[in-house]
Amino acid sequence: MLIVAKDVSDLRVFTLAEVYDLYTLDEGQDFYGFLSQDFFPDGICCVWEESGRYVAALRLQRWRDGYLLEGLQTHREHRGKGYATRLVSAALEALKMEKVYSHISRENSPSIALHTACGFHKILDYATYLDGSVHPDSDTYVYENPRC
């Protein structure tokens, strides 16, 4: 199930029992902490929830003439099950954004395959992050909604 949050307060609050079993993405980082960090003004957080648990999430931020998809993560226990693909596809469909960009490391072949399957294509052989820094080891991809 897709959950769209325009503010960190829109995210479901964990119960006390869940606090002891928070998802970890990488050592020491809880999933809720990941979702709520860097919530920029006009940012959007999309979460895929399965059986009452967050299993994948992404953030979208206004960028250039569209949005920048960043922070796409799937909990390690749920990787390889198609949740991230479902999340990206559902978010693109639900939000009806004209253009969505994504920066992907050239070494991240699973993410490149996911983005390509969701209709993204490569437009630049570098990435310019929100802070203006340029990363030559990542490429920029774009999704252009054919219905807009």
Q: Across the structure, where does each feature detected by a protein language model lie?
A:
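Conserved GNAT acetyl-CoA-binding A-motif
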Residues: 95-106
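A generic structural signal for beta-strand entry/edge sites
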Residues: 64-66, 99, 140
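Conserved acetyl-CoA-binding loop-helix of GNAT-fold acetyltransferases
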Residues: 74, 80-94, 113, 117
